[in-house]
Amino acid sequence: MYAREYRSTRPHKAIFFHLSCLTLICSAQVYAKPDMRPLGPNIADKGSVFYHFSATSFDSVDGTRHYRVWTAVPNTTAPASGYPILYMLDGNAVMDRLDDELLKQLSEKTPPVIVAVGYQTNLPFDLNSRAYDYTPAAESRKTDLHSGRFSRKSGGSNNFRQLLETRIAPKVEQGLNIDRQRRGLWGHSYGGLFVLDSWLSSSYFRSYYSASPSLGRGYDALLSRVTAVEPLQFCTKHLAIMEGSATQGDNRETHAVGVLSKIHTTLTILKDKGVNAVFWDFPNLGHGPMFNASFRQALLDISGENANYTAGCHELSH
């Protein structure tokens, strides 16, 4: 499954979007629960013809969350500029779904180092930890008034980002020839929310891949921050928002009307500012299937020649 891009008629100031297919906003009851069956051996355990793997453990500063980080390094020599590198959230599920067929495709381009940031569990997702790590504090809701998945503690994205950028990344990149101009971050759902928040808050990465970000779960205020960006501060960064078109019978769009208007305004403002951003539509894919499709697309994108994006905002200096 490949993404379909939507282009503006204005060159170098493009932001790709298709609001009729945009289904970022969903209510709690219309999301299918993730498959939480224990995982078996992954590609690191089985071995690959194209990559070799290592795993490292980390703990949060407060000692309450425990991480397992897999690093996959191509078996080919790094180019003179260094390997591209993609950090991927929900690393347990990523590693479970990564296969040698995809790694072969990557090896035919400029294969990236893959860093799958997961948790010390045999489950595909640590639901409590990711709910805290991937959500921004400013938009956190009063979860004690909610039940189910929304009763989980949230608002720890700043702490997790500091861990990722100051401890995890330096450790996994140690001894590797990395192209810092092709360093990317991918996340889905709450992970997509974290990527969008990181695009606003950090310049550590160059490419930000936000897949099906959970903006409709009380975090749509993040769009106000997006609208307020100063374009010159984002000239070195590239944002890709990835979303699946609603499938037949999917009623998520009925919950999106109010926020879709905000998204339309946000995208228009970004477009006018020349911010380097794209929207990739995945036809006929729902929220869950977007996990696989989006992480594969992000890997293929960062391994391609087009990964060295030029900033659209340079036009504003004329």
From Swiss-Prot:
Locations listed in the record: Cell inner membrane
Membrane topology: Single-pass membrane protein
Enzyme Commission number(s) of this protein: 3.1.1.107
One GO location term (cellular component): plasma membrane
Record carries keyword Membrane: yes
Membrane-spanning segments: 13-32
Keyword Cell membrane included in the entry's annotation: yes
Active-site residues, as the UniProt record annotates them: 189, 287
Record annotation: effect of changing residue 253 to A: Retains 78% of activity
Alphabetized UniProt keyword annotations: Cell inner membrane, Cell membrane, Hydrolase, Membrane, Serine esterase, Transmembrane, Transmembrane helix
Listed result of changing residue 245 to E: Retains 84% of activity
GO molecular function: carboxylic ester hydrolase activity
Pfam families listed in its UniProt record: Esterase
Effect of residue 90 to A/N: Loss of activity
Reaction it catalyzes: enterobactin + H2O = N-(2,3-dihydroxybenzoyl)-L-serine trimer; monoglucosyl-enterobactin + H2O = [N-(2,3-dihydroxybenzoyl)-L-seryl]2-N-(C-5-[deoxy-beta-D-glucosyl]-2,3-dihydroxybenzoyl)-L-serine + H(+); diglucosyl-enterobactin + H2O = N-(2,3-dihydroxybenzoyl)-L-seryl-[N-(C-5-[deoxy-beta-D-glucosyl]-2,3-dihydroxybenzoyl)-L-serine]2 + H(+); triglucosyl-enterobactin + H2O = [N-(C-5-[deoxy-beta-D-glucosyl]-2,3-dihydroxybenzoyl)-L-serine]3 + H(+)
Role noted for this protein: Catalyzes the hydrolysis of both the apo and Fe3(+)-bound forms of enterobactin (Ent), monoglucosyl-C-Ent (MGE), diglucosyl-C-Ent (DGE) and triglucosyl-C-Ent (TGE). It prefers apo siderophores as substrates and hydrolyzes the Fe3(+)-bound siderophores very inefficiently. Tends to hydrolyze the trilactone just once to produce linearized trimers. May hydrolyze and linearize some or all of apo enterobactins while they are being exported.
Domain notes: Contains a canonical alpha/beta-hydrolase fold with an atypical catalytic dyad.
Subunit: Monomer.
Record family assignment: Belongs to the esterase D family.
Name of the protein: Apo-salmochelin esterase
Originating organism: Escherichia coli O6:H1 (strain CFT073 / ATCC 700928 / UPEC)
Gene: iroE
